[in-house]
Amino acid sequence: MKIMSKLNDQQQFRRDKLKNLVKNGFNFPSSTFEHDNLVEINEKFSQKSKEFFLENQVKIAFAGRLIRQRGPFFIIFSQNLQIQAYISKKFQKKNEFIFANLDLGDIIEVSGYLFKTQTGQLSIKVNNFSLLTKSLHPLPDQYYGIENPDEKYRKRYLDLLVNSESAKTFRLRSKIISLIRTFFDSQGFLEVDTPVLHPVLGGASAKPFITYYNSLSQNFYLRIATELPLKKLLVAGFDRVYEIGKIFRNEGFDSTHNPEFTSIEFYQAYANLEKIMDQTENLFRFLFEKLNLDPANFDFSNKKINFLEKFARYDMIEITSKLMNFDLKSANFADLVEKAKKEGVKIEPFFKKGHLINKFFEKFVEPTLINPTFIIGHPIEISPLAKSNPNNPNFTLRAELFICGKEFANMFDELNDPIDQLSRFQAQIIEKNQGNQEASEIDNEFVQALEYGMPPAGGCGIGIDRLTMLLTKNESIREVILFPQLKPKKD
């Protein structure tokens, strides 16, 4: 059991004040007033003259955190605004005990009448005051905030209190998710919820988190994708579905990866890959428009990105061959192995030709894709859920969207042939036995669903955290996840 570290003077003073308050009946009371909407109050009255308030009594009530005090002026943070309250010396003296035990960071409730100061600042003259919550720690400096990044992520609640940019980021994240819902809802998509715990691993290539289901005496996986249950709904006749939710992949974390992340997957019956690429492109344009961002000259990661022009589209093997100056189409597996060794590409025991083509793409092409670019035609070995290309069965009707050298979306013309799907799953089992820890298992229930007939469809997955990084211009995923996973803190 961890023993609490010794209190510093400030913490001890605050605890002593709390003891005094408790002795005199303080018990962290509930709020007593109906609170006003301060945003509306500010919009309605901020431009009124001093004389207006002399002629009209406007009474308001609200609660918030005391963040600064100068004499009779108290700055209260409430509803994402800083409101100035005037509390006269006479009122403070009348309530001397409470004010003697008040500290910055305490949560207070006030009511009174609006007025304008000599400098024209909208303020409230307080005639009712109560202490709701006693803060036992001083807040970080309002100007400097929390300088240690690790501490900022561990104590995000403090970061949000003192860092307006952090607070702005997460309000914008909420708006982005709301806009995504609006985009799909307006097109007749149905939002659904599917299980987080899966008895069979599938839907993506990733290492899973494993848990144990006591009542079933069976291991389950935290989902690595929502793809398979959503495609079952296509079988069920739900022609347009999407899900926004948490995904879990038991892998490392860096500036663009977190093991627990949020994604949207959407599926549309009777849509092909071209339609899904257009839909994805339209979603980005919709978000830029609604967020009032400049699509033609968007600054991100010290680069100018153009979202206004139609997104580029390249065939994977063609652009990789071009940038490598090496003909991947005519090369056999032995040629690719030799080339991989020369280029320092690690070769796994389960690799086939398609795996190596993908590795070459990641090394030579991916970092060069700055403007929005769809890469089309992935090898069948790395795309077990996508339809094969009828003109070249070794490749698939699959695309990924890259921006600034990073993947932002992954989409397929969805495989709906149950015989082919079972064969793909069986190939994944062979890979797993050869050491591929990210290979899928055979999901017989999904195959059976396909046997009843799934309409031709297109689908896409987009990481919302990475999308939020882009739209808020943050270069670390930890800046857009409220409580990112961190290494255990050393005592």
Swiss-Prot record:
Protein residues bound to Mg(2+) 1: E400, E407
Gene3D superfamilies named in the record: Bira Bifunctional Protein, Domain 2, Nucleic acid-binding proteins
UniProt GO MF annotations: ATP binding; lysine-tRNA ligase activity; magnesium ion binding; tRNA binding
Cofactor(s), names only, from the UniProt record: Mg(2+)
UniProt keyword terms in alphabetical order: Aminoacyl-tRNA synthetase, ATP-binding, Cytoplasm, Ligase, Magnesium, Metal-binding, Nucleotide-binding, Protein biosynthesis
Signal peptide: none
Disulfide bonds: none
Pfam families tied to this protein: tRNA-synt_2, tRNA_anti-codon
Alphabetical list of PROSITE patterns matching this protein: AA_TRNA_LIGASE_II
Binding, Mg(2+) 2: E407
Subcellular localization, as worded in the UniProt entry: Cytoplasm
Enzyme Commission designation: 6.1.1.6
Family (UniProt): Belongs to the class-II aminoacyl-tRNA synthetase family.
Protein's name in the database: Lysine--tRNA ligase
Lineage per the UniProt record: Bacteria, Bacillati, Mycoplasmatota, Mycoplasmoidales, Metamycoplasmataceae
